[in-house]
From Swiss-Prot:
It is found in: Cytoplasm. The active site is at C397 (amidino-cysteine intermediate). The lineage of its organism: Bacteria, Bacillati, Bacillota, Bacilli, Bacillales. It is an enzyme of class 3 (hydrolase). Its EC number is 3.5.3.6. One of its GO terms (cellular component) is cytoplasm. It comes from the Bacteria. This is Arginine deiminase. The gene is arcA. Belongs to the arginine deiminase family.
């Protein structure tokens, strides 16, 4: 039986990937709630969907199997045969703890599986449920929050709720409350969808963990090494716990490299500033290093008495040592001009999706970064991005690779 999950590198030929087509959750963003929903602007959904469809077709043209999160979730929910248990979990994690939770549950239970999944993703407005007698003071206030269930507009960034490492997966505790429920869909799919439930899929780290971990910070360097960013969204303690889990249960993993990056929104995950594009080539945002090209990296290995942690500053040399090559090439996002570099990094110039060794998908808007990649011998497929980029994520962010060929 073929493995349902297999990721042993960032660059092996991509075979199967999970995406989420932008939907009506994006139309529930309003200016007042932009910040809490983690957006800087309101996208135009119709164009966003066209751009996403173009992106998906680009992958399909490369013989990549593209699976949709919303479709798998509905199929898994039908297979589970217990909508109420799943719905209760969703509502409980939405902080609907008063009587309104009962109204929400009863309303959503009237939907079939596809409709329920769509509604849970899109969010549930208070105006959608028939008017009832108001019993509580908070319901009588003139200033009313418009949602019973918040929309999940970041769901099209399927990279973050989970990440495949080897034949197992991390189902992540998301840092921001606006994204916490996203990984419930992944949990549902892995547990109940026939594509995955018939196999014993190891869970390296679960969403009940006490510390946040997000897939944009998880990079599988090779069969023996994982890189994890310590960032705005991923806690150092989560990295340590993940390393302990991998060393105990994934015998092929020998090292975890923890890379410390600035805790800012523009650098929210490691893959916004660093991605692998070929066997010894990487894109990098120059601003995460000092003038000597250094940044903090910590090598975590299994020792006789627990974890052994070795601090280093020479990041490029560490990568070369792990890959067992004389040196690696760092291709600067936006080049050496600090203005161009900052602009293109903001628009995800470093967030490449490798679909094969030396072959990537990027946003078309980052012309300097794309030209530099081509000069370095990388085959670049550009996709349109005027609306997709408003969510602060690029091609890597919009995909959760499930299967890659081994190198």
């Amino acid at each position: 039986m073929e493995k349902a999950l297999n990721i042993t590198s960032e660059i092996g030929k991509l075979q199967t990937v999970l995406v989420k087509r932008p939907g009506s959750e994006l139309e529930n963003i309003t200016p007042e709630y932009l910040e809490s929903l983690l957006f800087d602007d309101i996208p135009y959904l119709k164009m966003m969907q066209k751009e996403h469809d173009f992106f998906v077709k680009r992958m399909q043209d490369s013989n990549i199997e593209v699976l949709y999160l919303e479709k798998l979730a509905a199929e898994a929910l039908r297979k589970a045969g217990n909508k109420e248990t799943f719905l209760t979990k969703m509502i409980n994690e939405s902080n609907q703890m008063d009587e309104s939770a009962l109204y929400v549950r009863d309303y959503l239970m009237s939907f079939n599986e596809e409709e329920m999944i769509r509604k849970l993703m899109a969010g549930l407005k208070k105006s959608e449920i028939p008017e009832r007698k108001k019993k509580h003071l908070n319901e009588m206030m003139s200033e009313q929050y418009p949602f019973f269930l918040d929309p999940l507009p970041n769901l099209y960034f399927t990279r973050d709720p989970a990440a495949v490492i080897g034949s197992g997966v991390t189902i992540n505790k998301m840092f921001q409350p606006a994204r916490r429920r996203e990984s419930i869909f992944i949990e549902l799919i892995l547990k109940h969808h026939p594509r995955f439930s018939n196999q014993e899929v190891p869970i390296w780290s679960g969403r009940e963990e006490p510390f946040s971990l997000e897939g944009g910070d998880e990079l599988v360097l090779n069969e023996e090494t994982v890189i994890v960013g310590v960032s705005e969204r991923t806690d150092a303690r989560a990295v340590e716990r993940l390393a302990e889990s991998l060393f105990a249960r994934a015998p092929k993993i020998k090292k975890v490299l923890a890379v410390e990056i600035p805790e800012t929104r523009s650098f929210m995950h490691l893959d916004t500033v660093f991605t692998m594009v070929s066997d010894a080539q990487f894109t990098i945002h120059p601003a995460i290093q000092n003038q000597q090209g250094e940044l903090n990296v910590y090598i975590l290995e299994k020792g006789k008495n627990g974890l052994e942690i070795t601090p280093r500053r020479d990041f490029r040399r560490v990568i070369a040592e792990v890959l067992e090559v004389p040196e690696v090439e760092f291709i600067p996002c936006g080049g050496e001009d600090v203005i161009v570099s900052a602009r293109e990094q903001w628009n995800d110039g470093a967030n490449t999706l490798a679909i094969a060794p030396g072959e990537v998908i990027t946003y078309d808007r980052n012309q300097v970064s794309n030209d530099l990649l081509r000069r370095a011998g990388i085959k670049v497929h550009e996709v349109i991005s005027s609306e997709l980029s408003r969510g602060r994520g690029g091609p890597r962010c919009m995909t959760m690779p499930l299967v890659r060929e081994n190198l």
